[in-house]
């Protein structure tokens, strides 16, 4: 990108962009929902397609001059269907939350009962939190994980489903480190006559690479973000069976959105093309290898993890025996140039603004090229920061030495 063009018009924004790039280069990024896009994806986001209004769908627009953005959207849709083996795809959602909203609007009515994963147990705001539209428009009931194992309690899911008879069951999570049994969810949904929706936002890249079971054969509707493990632009997408295609498309436009962001849809198309390659599959394998290496190194050093490890790209540190809260550790790590987020753990005695846990993920560090031995180094730094308030300078030195080996966006600015 040419930062000087921006600087001539708006030096304050240019300065903010430049400093953010420096931050990304000089910190170890362990937020599980973040990643670094390819230059091709980034360039597509800054393309002239940003100028084009295109309400509607390809070949059914409410504006003229859409012949080339139609090509971009068709490519995105076809690539996404191929990636996950879906019958229908909608690539217009501006975010994962918008994708979820459209799915709800398509399948159920206000006031209907929905069964979703408890936010405190690893679910998402849009899975029924009372502070979110989902918990205000619909009657959500929740399931969670077993206190003794940290795994989803599928027997509880079935009991709650039989008791409340939901119209829709939502599977998927934002902080769950284990494989999700979509087949079991389908069986439970069928027993109570419910639709099954899967939110695979966090694991979409792993699913695309065959490293996590694919929800598409089991779910009526699947939603996702296009960033996170998929490594695309910030946005959402919806996959569904053909019988729900018309309802999904109508719920998205005109139901919940107006004009789509065509520059973002083009970037999604680029991302999906990248995800169809063998290189992407190998990259996803490295994400999981790094996650397991980081998790094992933390546990070997006495740190408890929710569920005792990970099957995917993320893990939850249970800090209750360390004398430090999630909020405190997030701050301490940020001070030594490691970025993460505090996160509630199941049955957390502390509030969501403090928490007894921290969530870590490996997509971004894997994108930089880091390997399992680097995860051991990162784990050792984290444990020393937890146990010694005076370790800050040594930790910063170790972080800087590690990052020197893995430059990021060297030619960007």
From Swiss-Prot:
Example of a GO cellular component annotation carried by this entry: cytosol
Cofactor (UniProt): pyridoxal 5'-phosphate
Keyword Cytoplasm in record: yes
Residues of the site described as Plays an important role in substrate specificity: 227
Modified residues annotated as N6-(pyridoxal phosphate)lysine in this record: 228
EC identifiers of the protein: 2.1.2.1
Primary enzyme class: transferase
Its job: Catalyzes the reversible interconversion of serine and glycine with tetrahydrofolate (THF) serving as the one-carbon carrier. This reaction serves as the major source of one-carbon groups required for the biosynthesis of purines, thymidylate, methionine, and other important biomolecules. Also exhibits THF-independent aldolase activity toward beta-hydroxyamino acids, producing glycine and aldehydes, via a retro-aldol mechanism.
Entry-linked PANTHER family: SERINE HYDROXYMETHYLTRANSFERASE (PTHR11680), SERINE HYDROXYMETHYLTRANSFERASE 1 (PTHR11680:SF35)
Official protein name in the record: Serine hydroxymethyltransferase
Biological source species: Thermoanaerobacter pseudethanolicus (strain ATCC 33223 / 39E) (Clostridium thermohydrosulfuricum)
């Amino acid at each position: 990108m040419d930062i000087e063009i921006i600087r001539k018009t708006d030096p304050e924004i240019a300065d903010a962009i430049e400093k953010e790039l420096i931050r990304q280069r000089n910190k170890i990024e362990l937020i599980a929902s973040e990643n670094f896009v390819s230059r091709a994806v980034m360039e597509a986001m800054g393309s002239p397609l940003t100028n084009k209004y295109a309400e509607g769908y390809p070949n059914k627009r409410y504006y003229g001059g859409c012949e080339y953005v139609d090509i971009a959207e068709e490519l995105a849709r076809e690539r996404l269907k191929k990636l996950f083996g879906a019958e229908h795809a909608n690539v217009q959602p501006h975010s994962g939350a918008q994708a979820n909203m459209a799915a709800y609007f398509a399948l159920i009515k206000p006031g209907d009962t929905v069964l979703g994963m408890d936010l405190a147990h690893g679910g998402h705001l849009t899975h029924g939190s009372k502070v979110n539209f989902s918990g205000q428009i619909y009657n959500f009931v929740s399931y969670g994980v077993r206190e003794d194992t940290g795994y989803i309690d599928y027997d509880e899911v079935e009991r709650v489903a039989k008791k409340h008879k939901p119209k829709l069951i939502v599977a998927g999570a934002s902080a769950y480190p284990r494989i999700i049994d979509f087949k079991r969810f389908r069986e439970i949904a069928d027993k109570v006559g419910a639709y099954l929706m899967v939110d695979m936002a966090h694991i979409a890249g792993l699913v695309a690479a065959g490293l996590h079971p694919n929800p598409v054969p089991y779910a009526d509707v699947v939603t996702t973000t296009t960033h996170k493990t998929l490594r695309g632009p910030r946005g959402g997408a919806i996959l569904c069976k053909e019988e729900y295609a018309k309802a999904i498309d109508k719920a998205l436009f005109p139901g919940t959105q107006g004009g789509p962001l065509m520059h973002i849809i083009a970037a999604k198309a680029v991302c999906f093309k990248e995800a169809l390659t063998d290189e992407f599959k190998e990259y996803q394998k490295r994400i999981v290898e790094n996650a397991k290496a980081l998790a094992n190194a933390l546990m070997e050093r006495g740190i408890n993890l929710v569920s005792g490890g990970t099957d995917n790209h993320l893990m939850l540190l249970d800090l209750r025996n360390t004398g430090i809260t999630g909020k405190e550790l997030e701050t301490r790590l940020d001070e030594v140039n490691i970025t993460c987020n505090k996160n509630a753990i199941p049955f957390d005695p502390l509030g969501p603004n403090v928490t007894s846990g921290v969530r870590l993920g490996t997509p971004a560090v894997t994108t930089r090229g880091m390997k399992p031995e680097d995860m051991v180094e990162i784990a050792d730094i984290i444990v020393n920061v937890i146990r010694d308030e005076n370790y800050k300078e040594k930790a910063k030195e170790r972080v800087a030495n590690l990052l020197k080996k893995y430059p990021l966006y060297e030619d960007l600015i």
